[in-house]
Swiss-Prot record:
Organism: Anaeromyxobacter sp. (strain Fw109-5)
Protein name per UniProt: UDP-N-acetylglucosamine 1-carboxyvinyltransferase
Pfam family, one: EPSP_synthase
Transferase keyword on record: yes
Keyword check for Transcription: no
Length: 422
């Protein structure tokens, strides 16, 4: 098992490139199941979750391999028939595995998918996925830890469905299923994240008829067949946001290439409020951290609000603020597990339910810490970069689920960071 070792307190200078978005790539790769033939998905990050989904497709009878001629390209061949099952052994570590459910039942009329795993950050129910698919005519059974879905008529049928709560993967799952359903589907109270817009764009390139992605209502006119996919995945706004937060640490000056301002506006607003200078540059954003951050209050919300996936990284920055900040988590339960580890570095944080009060300190001090989930691990890396002395981040398999060799991206900026065997 690996650990990340950081000798902190060194200013960061330079430019870093953003990888493709994991949370866009995964549903787009799953969407390839909707059409027979050879698919090419470009700008796909080399991450554990992506590799797991590739193994799942191979288990089903597809071929999936990296295209040696193009960095970041994933070639997928989908046959006329597959084994429509996602077994627990393959998907136990990846919550996003549930996105194969919609494509499988839409194209082959049946699916058996293990209930998802992934980060342990509270309740992430898939009931909205199942209600949406039921509205399209699927019959759902939960048995022995699996979701079994069938289309009794052979094909799903269009319907109007309102999500009880906004759900990104739920919106994606039902939208993909509706693409091959008979008739029109109207989805209401949809999630609005950029990754949903990118998935819709990929499906439209396959011949789907989808409008409204990125808004509250999405309309899908079902078609009988789709064609193979060739699509470039958008940049990862959370990875970009993590590097923006690194640039906002005191004394740093970092340019994040490939970062789309419209995707990170809520974060940029808070970074500027904290005193960082954020400047649009050709192909990205430049962030300059000038002295200790100012305290700011942050409240997470679905897109276009402040992303829950940036809450931990923002907390790491505010640990050094000149004053007290309040962070309120409204999206997920149990998402302050990084607090105890930040406290080991000298942070002063008090948690009361869904709110954390961060009393800034002049400096942090390096120490061994342990990652509890994906974004918590990123927060610990940021804190370690700013801390005086050596920080060791353990259980970095969490980090590898969402960041493509983060140490290799930070080192050219001047960070004294390396990966070692724990």
């Amino acid at each position: 098992m690996d650990k990340i070792v950081i000798d902190g307190g060194v200013p960061l200078r330079g430019s870093v490139a953003t990888s493709g978005a994991k949370n866009a790539a995964l549903p787009i790769i799953a969407g390839a199941l909707l059409a027979e033939g050879d698919h090419l998905v470009r700008n796909v990050p080399d991450l554990a979750d992506v590799r797991t989904l590739g193994r799942l497709l191979v288990h089903m009878g597809c071929q999936a391999e990296r295209n040696a001629g193009e960095k970041g390209a994933l070639w997928i061949r989908v046959p006329a028939a597959v084994q429509p099952e996602a077994p627990y052994e393959l998907v136990k570590t990846m919550r996003a595995s549930v996105v194969v459910l919609g494509p499988l039942v839409a194209r082959w009329g049946k699916a058996r998918v293990s209930l998802p795993g992934g980060c342990a950050i509270g309740a992430r129910p898939i009931d909205q996925h199942l209600k949406g698919l039921s509205a399209l005519g699927a019959e759902i059974r939960l048995e022995h830890g699996y979701v079994e879905a069938t289309a009794p008529r052979g094909r799903l049928r269009g319907a109007t469905f309102t999500f009880d709560a906004q759900t990104v993967t739920g919106t994606e799952n039902v939208m993909m299923a509706a693409a091959l359903a008979e008739g029109e589907t109207l989805l209401r109270n949809c999630a609005r994240e950029p990754e949903i817009v990118d998935l819709a764009a990929a499906l439209v390139r396959m011949g789907a008829r989808i409008s409204g992605a990125g808004a509250d209502e999405i309309r899908i006119e079902g078609v009988e067949t789709l064609r193979p996919l060739d699509h470039v995945v958008i940049a990862d706004r959370i990875e970009a946001g993590t590097f923006l937060a690194a640039g906002a640490l005191p004394g740093n000056d970092v340019t994040v290439q490939g970062c789309v301002l419209e995707h990170v506006e809520a974060l940029v607003e808070k970074l500027r409020a904290a005193g960082a200078e954020v400047l649009p540059v050709d192909g990205g954003l430049r962030v300059v951290g000038d002295g200790r951050p100012r305290p700011v209050d942050v409240r997470t919300a679905p897109h276009p609000g402040f992303p829950t996936d940036m809450q931990a990284q923002m907390m790491a920055l505010l640990c050094l603020a000149d004053g007290s900040s309040k962070i309120t988590e409204t999206v997920f339960e149990n998402r302050f597990m990084h607090v105890q580890e930040l406290q080991r570095l000298g942070a002063e944080i008090a948690v009361d339910g869904k709110t954390a009060v961060v009393k800034g300190v002049p400096e942090l001090s390096g120490a061994p810490v342990m990652a509890s989930d994906l974004r918590a691990s990123a927060a610990l890396v940021l804190a370690g970069l700013a801390a005086q002395g050596t920080t060791e981040v353990h259980r970095v398999y969490h980090l590898d689920r969402g960041y493509e060799r983060i140490e290799e991206k930070l080192a050219p900026l001047g960070a004294r960071i390396r990966r070692e065997k724990a």
